[in-house]
């Protein structure tokens, strides 16, 4: 497995680091830790404001570079363990673009970053950098809002991308110390009663109950099948079926069950599946209090390699 952790010294990126440290990285993993120095256009309004009237740009660059190099060194020390390689990289540029480009360059299976960073224009619930990275990368992305991933809630609707999310959780071997729960939501399509009015004989509660019951039976089958796959991969897994829109059901269950991490596929069976990121995944990403993993494809852990060891930090300046 190849993974990219993006950090910037913010409290949110500290959660991303702690989440990364909590994962059970399989032997042979290559983990790259990245931090991005801001361009001149991004300096204004940032937390690196010194509070003095004027500081030469070169001096500010030097201060921030020293700070970020120390940040990388601490992060690599936190993540290093036998059997995995950990490297560091420092790049100057536009944060979201650099993260996407480096993920592509190293062939990352997973990108991990905080929900919000140091940018001056970060939005309230999801930062502009993390939102863009989720939209633009071709691999799975974990947006961290919690320091671990011990309790994992996984949404499924039976679609291929939902099954890829299930396969990612089990096949990656990242969550062997975790407990999982699979959720399905019965969201009744109103098209079955369109054309009727409350006065029509056909407009009764019975059809609605029947549709909900059928949906619940289907949901129980879907969640049971997914749970069986996860149990085969060694995860203690339970199931639950909710009634209502999938995004609201997932966010509610994550709160009630106290999930650390919510896992969703990029698209489901909804009408908006033509979008790069499906409506359910986007809503959960913006509104869940837990970390969110947007899974794009399954990945299998590499078999253990004899003699595998951690690599020393190799800071790359660009």
Residues covered by each model-derived region:
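A short acidic, glycine-rich active-site loop
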Residues: 53-70, 203-221
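Fold-core signature of tandem repeat domains
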Residues: 71, 99, 166, 218, ...
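Conserved residues at beta->alpha junctions
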Residues: 7, 90, 115, 156, ...
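Small/aliphatic-rich secondary-structure junction motif
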Residues: 1-56, 82-87, 149-209, 229, ...
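Structural beta-alpha unit
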Residues: 12, 19-22, 38-41, 55-58, ...
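A generic structural signal for short
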Residues: 9, 63-64, 87-88, 118, ...
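Gly/Ser-rich helix-loop-strand patches that form or flank binding pockets
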Residues: 2, 12-17, 22, 26, ...
């Amino acid at each position: 497995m190849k993974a990219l952790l993006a950090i910037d010294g913010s409290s949110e990126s500290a959660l991303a680091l702690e989440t990364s440290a909590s994962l059970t990285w399989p032997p042979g993993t290559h983990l790259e830790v990245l931090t991005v120095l801001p361009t001149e256009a991004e300096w204004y309004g940032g937390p690196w404001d010194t509070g003095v009237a004027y500081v030469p740009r070169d001096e500010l660059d030097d201060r921030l570079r020293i700070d970020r190099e120390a940040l990388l060194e601490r992060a690599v020390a936190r993540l290093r363990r036998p059997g995995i390689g950990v490297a560091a990289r420092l790049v100057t540029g536009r944060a979201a673009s650099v993260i996407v480009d480096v993920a592509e360059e190293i062939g990352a299976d997973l990108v991990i970053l905080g929900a919000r960073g140091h940018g001056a224009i970060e939005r309230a619930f999801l930062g502009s950098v993390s939102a863009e990275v989720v939209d633009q990368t071709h691999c799975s992305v974990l947006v961290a809002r919690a320091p671990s991933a011990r309790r994992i809630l996984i949404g499924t609707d039976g679609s291929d991308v939902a099954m890829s999310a299930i396969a990612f959780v089990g096949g990656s071997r990242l969550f062997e110390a975790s407990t999982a729960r699979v959720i399905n939501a019965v969201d009744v399509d109103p098209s079955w009663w369109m054309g009727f009015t409350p006065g029509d004989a056909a407009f009764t509660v019975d059809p609605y109950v029947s549709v909900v019951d059928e949906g619940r039976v289907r949901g129980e089958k879907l969640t049971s099948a997914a749970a069986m796959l996860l149990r085969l991969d060694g995860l203690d897994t339970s199931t639950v079926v909710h009634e209502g829109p999938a995004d609201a059901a997932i966010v509610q269950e994550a709160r009630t069950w106290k999930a650390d991490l919510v896992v969703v596929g990029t698209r489901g069976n909804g009408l908006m599946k033509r979008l790069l990121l499906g409506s359910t995944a986007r809503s959960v990403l913006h509104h869940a209090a837990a970390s969110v993993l947007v899974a794009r494809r399954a990945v299998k852990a590499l078999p253990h390699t004899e003699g595998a060891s951690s690599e020393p930090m190799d800071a790359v300046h660009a």
